[in-house]
Amino acid sequence: MIAVFVVQNPFVTMALKATIYKAQLQLADMDRNVYADPGMTIARHPSETDERMMVRVLALALNWPADTSEGTLELAKDMWEPDEPALWHKNFSDEILHWIEVGQPDDKRLMKACGRARKVSLYAFQSSTPVWWSGIETKLTRAHNLTVWQIPTEQSQALATLTQRTMQLQFTVQDGTAWINDGE
């Protein structure tokens, strides 16, 4: 009797491709007097969750520039390129005006971003954010151009439920509160 075993080589892996999402946003930010209808194509990295992707979309909506004469805010390739943020606003001479991170980057990454951009924003959303922040807060005292926002876990998870391959999202901001609606 002959036994045949098929063994897969654990070192051979296939590169997974990004999943493409389309989003059409309607922005009404009454606090900043910004009204826009940007459309975007989102290349979602295979390891990126719905929650993280939608926090990137939220960050884009909350930071859309009122004046696009100095360029626009764009989704960057932070999951593929270690030297890029989640989003950035670059002017036409390639200067980084606004560097936006999502999640829980380390203090070195944030300090490097503060040195490269005029303004840096971080949108943290995981339930472990308070513990993470207590570990790096004192290391960021020199980062005067850094603003950190914490999105409550329940809200970021609710935002993730709006994920669809093709999305139509309305963002309304008034008195410091953001409402997000998918029309359903």
Where are these regions (language model features)?
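Extreme N-terminal leader/targeting regions
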Residues: 2, 7-49
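Short polybasic amphipathic segments
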Residues: 23-27, 87, 177-182
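Acidic-basic catalytic patches of nuclease active cores, encompassing PD-(D/E)XK
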Residues: 31-79
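Short His-Asn-centered micro-motif
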Residues: 76-78, 90, 100-103, 123-126
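N-terminal active-site wall of soluble small-molecule enzyme domains
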Residues: 81-91
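Conserved catalytic cores of phosphodiester-cleaving nucleases, focusing on short active-site segments
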Residues: 87-89, 96-113
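Hydrophobic beta-strand segments of well-ordered beta-sheets in folded domains
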Residues: 117-124, 144-148
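Domain-level recognition of nuclease-like catalytic cores that cleave nucleotide substrates
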Residues: 132-184
